């Protein structure tokens, strides 16, 4: 075998594929790692490929036991206690560097420096530790010792190596490699030092401002080389994604150099564990439900489909784990999977793990529980994946991950668990997936050019190497040297790497480097090898050719201007017909039709809705649902046990009962508040909620008001409305039906909001349409003549405040109606005007037109024109005829109909309607 050995040749080409020169059998080009493997094979010293995370785990276990008996103030006890995984990884890396330099884990002695004594103590106990295996450093040390033994003993051994050509000087190598190559020469291997190549014949620098500017220039230059049938090699030490886009655009294959990233599936592991940990992270659970596995272009949800779809609905109703909606979702999913026992078992197992056996981070996770939970995830990946798919690969990695976690003791901190998972799934560096090319080759490091001769195109020669770090203290270095361990100098290693790169570049004779001033907004540092190449020319009195990175005219192309049709957010024309009209509406639909009919049309007639995972309640919506349910459950219990003959009940303000119900429903309806970092918010919310709910019951009891029902469903006819089949049916749920002290039926609408004046203003301004809807339904049920005869009120569960115009509620302040521009003097007038406004919208839909006045009044240009600031005269954003029409429509909506203008700012689909978006 003929070996060409260079310090940076690991990964270099054995032959130069960009030339016509063919390689020969038994000729290889190697660096230190590859030569170590060859020698280990020839000397029968090969070891199975080691698993780095398992080695770290084994080292961590032994180090932990050693430090348990150490002085608690000694190095590195405190660091290990705070971050055991990182400390173990760093010490193992240091241990491997020592071993590769010849250290044999000498028995600790009194004169040994403390840090080395710790390493020696650990080294003695590694043999037999589960998960421990020798690493590359151990193999290198054994190769060094074995070759030295063969030299000393005079024994013959068939190495099968005839000659080694060293790209550099033997004296410059690290001590261990000087010994190894010297031993090989003593054993009969010819050793030759290759001569240093001469400086370059030509160096061209093409400079650009940014990578975006350099990409089309580089693509054009490479295209010119191909057109001229010139063989070349591209060096790309960073991603070529932008360059590849330009190459594909002009019809050339991509170079395929990309940053290595962990599989998106690997990111599911920490996501899954967060979702499985109580208190449950609902956002993590939503992410898990949104995760799919793609194999052979077929996408399957990670969580079984029948359960996934139902859990999405359950979480929209109750954003927590284990409540009634969750129970119903699991039961329905199992029923739907009755003919698929495998799917049913996965559903049962998932429900059991997350609801009945959740993980708990109580001073760390129980490692056995973590491994048990990961088994379900492993089965999902392996059952969905096939062959060499990414899915099956992730599944196969989970098995050793479970084994490793089990080796880390009984408990593991959440931080260390994340580190372990990252160690298994993380990647680094860059990878090349270039297509076959008879003229071009791609490498990621200048040294990988090896001994080839084709000219070079260097894409972004920037210095991104870390500065060499020496972790050995002077007293430790002195002790190691005295005991025969010659540590390599980090700076000397860096010089060897640079020299290897320079030799490979100089052999190519012709180099074109595409440089940029900034990368990712920061100044780009020039690669040191390029600096030396320029200095080579300077010493010869020459200069590199410097060109501006302007794209050649023949490679320039400008995009054709595209005309964008800006959607009209206010007025649209449609195919007229009854198909656009509803037959039944709720209050929310009614209000939407009045303020944003275009959005109602998108949602109710075109079926456009936000995805279920995007609408999981949070914030005030989540808390409001939780408190509503607390009130509902307490009322229903008392109705079942204590109702009067007329089916109503007076509920005492029992703080213990309220607090207990709040706590019981918390994980089902507001799991988000149980997460770390929310304790202050949770405490404040619990206190406010308890006080407000107790205040509600106290206020009603003091006024002699009894509760008749909560969440009472109703259906009534919207008399005089122009629906698809005549009068519309109006339906919904009333929050709380009450019987006043004088026997009159009334309604309370429960709210939870930080806007203290929102509903108070609605009552005073005569715009409380929701209360009017409730009043109409009660009046219909009890044959009351006027809506104003029905006492109605808002109760804010956050502020413990009742907003009403009816003094019979006993509120501290009874409000009076002072109609605003769009309000009504009483409930009956508001109802009639709202019906008039609704009919105007419905008649427009029937005729095939829709005018969204809500989108009109939220436009800044319209606001500036309609209500100009003092001293200004802005123009209308519309032509004169359109402005007149919109002004008339607004006047009619505000005075004759009902236009809930304050709610216009709340939009669901502004980008679709054109109310928002940059169309410039």
Language-model features: locations:
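RecB-family 4Fe-4S metal-dependent nuclease core
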Residues: 567-920
């Amino acid at each position: 075998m003929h070996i060409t050995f260079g310090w940076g040749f690991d990964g270099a080409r054995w032959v130069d594929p960009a030339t016509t020169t063919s390689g020969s059998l038994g000729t290889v080009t190697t660096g230190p790692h590859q030569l170590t493997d060859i020698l280990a094979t020839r000397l029968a010293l090969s070891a199975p490929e080691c698993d780095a995370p398992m080695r770290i785990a084994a080292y961590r276990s032994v180090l932990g036991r050693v430090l348990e008996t150490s002085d608690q103030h000694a190095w590195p006890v405190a660091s290990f206690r705070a971050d055991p995984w990182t400390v173990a990884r760093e010490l193992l890396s240091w241990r491997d560097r020592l071993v590769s330099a010849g250290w044999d884990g000498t028995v600790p002695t009194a004169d040994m420096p403390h840090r080395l004594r710790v390493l020696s103590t650990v080294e003695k106990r590694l043999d037999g530790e589960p998960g421990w295996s020798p690493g590359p450093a151990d193999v290198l040390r054994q190769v060094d010792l074995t070759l030295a033994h063969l030299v000393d003993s005079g024994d013959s051994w068939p190495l099968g190596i005839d000659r080694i050509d060293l790209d550099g000087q033997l004296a410059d190598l690290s001590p261990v490699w000087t010994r190894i190559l010297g031993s090989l020469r003593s054993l009969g291997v010819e050793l030759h030092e290759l001569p240093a190549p001469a400086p370059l014949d030509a160096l061209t620098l093409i400079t650009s401002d940014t990578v975006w500017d350099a990409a089309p220039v580089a693509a054009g230059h490479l295209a010119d080389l191909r057109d001229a049938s010139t063989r070349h090699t591209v060096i790309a030490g960073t991603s070529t994604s932008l360059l590849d886009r330009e190459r594909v655009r002009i019809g050339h294959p991509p170079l395929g150099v990309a940053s290595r990233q962990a599989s998106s599936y690997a990111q599911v592991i920490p996501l899954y564990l967060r979702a499985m940990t109580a208190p449950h992270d609902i956002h993590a659970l939503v992410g898990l439900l949104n995760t799919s596995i793609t194999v052979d272009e077929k996408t399957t949800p990670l969580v079984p489909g029948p359960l996934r779809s139902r859990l999405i609905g359950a979480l929209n109703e109750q954003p927590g784990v284990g409540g009634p909606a969750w129970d119903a979702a699991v039961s329905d999913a199992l029923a739907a999977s009755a003919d698929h026992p495998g799917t049913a078992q996965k559903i049962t197992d998932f429900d059991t793990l997350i609801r009945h056996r959740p993980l708990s981070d109580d001073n760390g996770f129980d490692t056995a529980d973590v491994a048990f939970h990961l088994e379900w995830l492993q089965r999902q990946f392996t059952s969905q994946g096939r062959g060499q798919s990414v899915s099956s690969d992730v599944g196969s990695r989970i098995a050793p991950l479970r084994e490793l976690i089990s080796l880390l003791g009984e408990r593991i901190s959440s931080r260390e668990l994340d580190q372990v998972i990252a160690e298994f799934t993380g990647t680094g560096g860059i990878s090349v997936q270039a297509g076959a090319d008879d003229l071009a080759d791609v490498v990621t490091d200048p040294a990988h050019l090896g001994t080839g001769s084709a000219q070079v195109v260097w894409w972004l020669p920037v210095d991104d190497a870390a500065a060499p770090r020496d972790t050995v203290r002077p007293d430790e270095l002195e002790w190691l040297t005295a005991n025969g361990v010659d540590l390599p100098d980090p700076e000397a290693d860096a010089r060897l790497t640079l020299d290897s790169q320079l030799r490979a570049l100089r052999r190519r004779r012709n180099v074109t480097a595409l440089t940029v001033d900034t990368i990712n907004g920061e100044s780009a540092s020039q690669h040191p090898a390029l600096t030396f190449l320029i200095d080579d020319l300077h010493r010869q009195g020459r200069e590199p050719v410097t060109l501006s990175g302007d794209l050649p005219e023949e490679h320039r192309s400008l995009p054709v201007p595209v005309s964008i049709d800006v959607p009209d957010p206010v007025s649209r024309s449609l195919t007229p017909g009854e198909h656009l009209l509803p037959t039944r509406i709720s209050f929310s639909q009614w209000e939407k039709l009045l303020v944003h009919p275009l959005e109602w049309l998108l949602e109710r007639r075109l079926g456009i809705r936000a995805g279920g995972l995007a609408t999981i309640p949070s914030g005030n919506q989540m808390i409001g649902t939780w408190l509503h349910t607390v009130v509902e459950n307490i009322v229903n219990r008392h109705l079942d046990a204590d109702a009067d003959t007329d089916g109503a009940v007076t509920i005492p303000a029992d703080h213990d009962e309220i607090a207990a119900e709040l706590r019981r429903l918390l994980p089902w309806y507001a799991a988000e508040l149980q997460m770390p970092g929310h304790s202050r918010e949770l405490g404040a919310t619990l206190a406010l909620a308890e006080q407000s709910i107790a205040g509600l019951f106290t206020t009603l009891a003091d006024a002699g008001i009894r509760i008749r029902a909560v969440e009472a469903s109703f259906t009534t006819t919207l008399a005089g409305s122009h629906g698809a089949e005549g009068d519309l049916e109006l339906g919904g749920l009333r929050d709380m039906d009450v019987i006043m002290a004088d026997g009159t039926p009334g309604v309370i609408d429960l709210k939870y909001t930080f806007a203290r004046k929102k509903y108070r203003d609605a009552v005073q301004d005569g715009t409380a349409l929701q209360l009017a809807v409730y009043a109409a339904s009660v009046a219909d049920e009890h044959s009351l003549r006027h809506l104003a005869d029905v006492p109605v009120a808002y109760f804010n569960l956050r502020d413990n405040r009742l907003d009403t115009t009816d003094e019979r509620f006993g509120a501290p302040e009874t409000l009076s109606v002072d109609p605003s521009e769009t309000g009504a003097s009483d409930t009956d007038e508001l109802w009639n005007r709202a019906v008039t406004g609704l009919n105007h919208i419905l008649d427009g839909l029937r005729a095939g037109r829709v005018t969204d006045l809500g989108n009109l009044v939220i436009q800044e240009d319209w606001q500036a024109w309609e209500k100009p600031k003092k001293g200004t005269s802005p123009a209308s954003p519309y032509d004169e005829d359109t402005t007149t029409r919109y002004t008339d429509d607004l006047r009619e909506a505000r005075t004759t109909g009902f236009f809930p203008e304050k709610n216009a700012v709340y939009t669901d689909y502004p980008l679709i309607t054109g109310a928002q978006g940059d169309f410039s």
